[in-house]
Design a protein with these regions (language model features):
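PLP-dependent enzyme catalytic core of the Aspartate aminotransferase-like
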Residues: 77, 81, 330-339, 345-380
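N-terminal small-domain helix-loop-helix segment of the aminotransferase-like
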Residues: 2-97, 104, 271-274, 291, ...
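Conserved glycine-rich beta-strand-loop-beta hairpin in the small C-terminal domain of fold type I
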Residues: 269, 285-293, 304-317
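Active-site phosphate-binding strand-loop segment of PLP-dependent enzymes
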Residues: 142-206
Length: 380
């Protein structure tokens, strides 16, 4: 049986690294995980308790495609709490993770063959989802001077859309209001659609994360319960779309997904009020971030932009290698630390970069830094 040309997507390298780390653990080794952007904490205890109680009284069948009304209303209220925005809950769409939101957004906004810009380095699945939908991803090389974020002068002509992320994966850098406003304005002047990936909002350490909705209502905003709310495996996310796009998205969602998992929606609703636990998680990430900023240079990784948010550091390792994939494999084998090659995020320049995640427990971060230091000292 033949495969479609659309199925020729690249592997998600971090998942391959995870599998190599799992195999090492199965062989009896202790591995420190700095490869994956997955919180070391579970969904908040209060959220899990709410689901347990609901399961005793509710069959948890299909919900409406846009999500349970209570959750959409609570998400809308988050925009008041975080950004002082009055958001109509009717514009909120609950999705099966942010990946589901991107599939819906790309399907609603673009036609086959359209060109969609994305900053590089950037989240690799943008490119692969676009290709699978017969769209053309256009990588936009960013610079260290602009903290690895695109600026209007970088945008090529002919784009049907632009995707940005702030805080960004893999760099953790953020777009301030002026920078975001300039990008949205330039995109709209081109007649292109603007998609803002905001899944790391809530995880910021230097300044406030700005939502694209503070600039314009004529944008798509994607968010998720995976990161700030520690719900990666629950596959629950959301997006906010212009009022006149809601019905379009609803029709596509009805046919593609029916609904986001009901159990995950119940859990997500309760998670949004578990403030003490969420704040405690953020304090751990802040401590881990400082450990990494201080410890990575001592280990020999001193070329990176300090992250404003998320839980990653993206380091230039050109002084050590021209093959980040082989270098990451060497670090896993000899140091017992799993890290992600930059090729996942930048297929052109990523052979000289690594991403380090500090989402795990603080004791793991300390041990990982100690191992990296010993490894680099031994490597010469």
């Amino acid at each position: 049986m033949r495969n479609s040309s659309r199925s020729s997507v690249d592997p998600f390298i971090v998942m391959d690294v995870m599998e190599a780390a799992r195999a090492a653990e199965a062989a009896g080794r202790h591995i420190i995980h700095m490869e994956v952007g997955q919180p070391g904490t579970p969904a908040p205890a209060g959220a899990r308790a709410a689901l347990s109680a609901t399961m005793e009284s509710d069959a948890l069948g299909y919900t409406v495609a846009l999500g349970i009304p209570e959750l959409r209303e609570r998400i809308a209220s988050l925009y008041k709490d975080w950004y002082n925005l009055d958001l109509d809950p009717a514009r909120v769409v609950v999705t099966p993770g942010s990946s589901g939101a991107f599939i819906l957004a790309f399907t609603a906004l673009f036609d086959a063959g359209d060109k969609v810009g994305l900053g590089e380095p950037g989240y690799p699945s943008y490119r692969q989802i676009l290709r699978a939908l017969d769209l053309e991803p256009v990588g936009i090389a960013t610079s260290a001077e602009n903290r690895l974020q695109p600026v209007p002068a970088d945008l090529p002509p002919g784009l049907a859309g632009l995707i940005t992320a702030s805080p960004a994966n893999p760099s953790g850098t953020m777009l301030d209001h002026d920078h975001l406003s300039a990008l949205i304005g330039a995109t709209q002047d081109m007649g292109a659609s603007f998609i803002s990936d905001e899944i790391y909002h809530g995880l910021q350490y230097e300044g406030r994360a700005v939502s694209a909705l503070e600039v314009s209502d004529d944008v798509y905003v994607v968010n998720s319960f995976s990161k700030y709310f520690s719900m990666t495996g629950w596959r629950a996310g959301w997006m906010v779309v212009p009022e006149d796009h809601v019905r379009v998205i609803e029709r596509i969602a009805q046919n593609m997904f029916i609904c986001a998992p009901h159990a995950s929606q119940v859990t997500a609703l309760a998670a949004m009020d578990c403030h003490d636990e969420l704040n405690a998680n953020l304090a751990v990430y802040a401590e881990n971030r400082q450990l990494m900023i201080d410890g990575l240079p001592r280990a020999g990784f001193d070329r990176f932009a300090p992250p404003d948010g998320a839980f990653y550091i993206y380091a230039d390792v050109s002084a050590h290698t021209d093959d980040s994939r082989a270098f990451a494999a060497e670090i896993l084998e000899k140091a017992g630390v799993a890290v992600t090659p930059g090729l996942d995020f930048d297929p052109v320049r990523g052979h000289q970069t690594l991403r380090f995640s500090y989402a795990r427990a603080t004791e793991d971060i300390r041990e990982g830094l100690a191992r990296l230091t010993r490894f680099m000292e031994g490597r010469g």
